[in-house]
């Protein structure tokens, strides 16, 4: 294939898993085509002399033979293969890499811990929404990366020699999930963290983002158990108690924890508890991407956007030919409503952002068909890749779009976990009203309105005579009033 190919591949030879990401460049952003992950547990093959066992190397080569088949269609200049902590440590890494290069047909680069941390940060910066000033945490199999930064720039980079595989072998070797093993694992992790904690705290952060399998597992557990997606120390301690209650690693059962992740979950959990405690982290969310995404965006030389969510929404509006003027019109009305009730309802800024995002996408279902457009919209948003939005935020957007008109499905608003159920109901009410009053698709036909909230009662005041002059509008509002009353949302329109 010629070098005009739009395909790119990034391979990460990690200490616990080998990963391959294949993407296609589309109009300045990336479309994921393939993700392959295999548990190789390379770090478990290191002995006390840091010799990598033949069995571990063979597991690695076997995995690379699978990857090699997919790489044949991609120009070598558009492939990056990096190896991390275990192959930095292994004294016989050269033997493994020589054969790996032969299998893949392209160079394998062993990167330093700092370079790994930088790439992880770039992957997060390109794919994760939220505040600009962030702390990124990635717990790997044999190393843990901690990075602070603002926008695209890192301010401090650390790669520490502790990981979920090495801590498993060191502190849970007897497969016993007792308090003593957890205490020893946490104490050791805190000792590794202590020398770098001051510098990380000095640079500071507004948001903390986790980019590892441990954090992914926590997210899956919390989604399965209907909790909100924010990881807190309290939740980590609860999960530790649950693990201790299970007694042994082979008996570890937590709702939402897959068998594949269970083996290294307790060791990863102990490291994460130590990080939360030592750095006094209030809460953490899951990153949209990490090392592999950093490699891909690096090959593409794409600048980091200041607002990833806005880029995502623009791309989707273009792709599904959404009427952007109408989306903006609905967003403007919704923002105006939100600003009038936010104090009474104690709404947070993130809720405003998510409401505006729902407005930007509310007509996406029309790209399938007018009939059942809200259901089509919810399906598309639930299943599209939305960089900058967390899984729980995607679910909330889909739920809001499902309930943008017609009778309200209250249970769906209560099943999302991005915001409390009451907030989801409030955002839904504002979205529905904004869509109604922007429905004429002209700025000059949107009436001047005031919206007041008194507990759950909404009072909407329209210009004098508006309802008389707009009989269809009056009918639509009467129907909306009825639908809101069915779910005990009191609405008065004057």
From Swiss-Prot:
UniProt EC number: 3.6.1.40
Residue ranges crossing the lipid bilayer per the database entry: none
Reaction(s) this enzyme catalyzes, per UniProt: guanosine 3'-diphosphate 5'-triphosphate + H2O = guanosine 3',5'-bis(diphosphate) + phosphate + H(+)
InterPro entries listed in its UniProt record: ATPase_NBD (IPR043129), GppA/Ppx_hydrolase (IPR050273), Guo-5TP_3DP_PyrP (IPR023709), Ppx_GppA_C (IPR048950), Ppx_GppA_N (IPR003695), PyroPPase_GppA_Ppx (IPR030673)
EC primary class: hydrolase
One of the GO biological process terms: nucleobase-containing small molecule interconversion
Keywords: Hydrolase
GO MF, one annotated term: guanosine-5'-triphosphate,3'-diphosphate diphosphatase activity
Pathway(s): Purine metabolism; ppGpp biosynthesis; ppGpp from GTP: step 2/2
Task performed by this protein: Catalyzes the conversion of pppGpp to ppGpp. Guanosine pentaphosphate (pppGpp) is a cytoplasmic signaling molecule which together with ppGpp controls the 'stringent response', an adaptive process that allows bacteria to respond to amino acid starvation, resulting in the coordinated regulation of numerous cellular activities.
Family listed: Belongs to the GppA/Ppx family. GppA subfamily.
Record-given protein name: Guanosine-5'-triphosphate,3'-diphosphate pyrophosphatase
Protein species of origin: Shigella flexneri
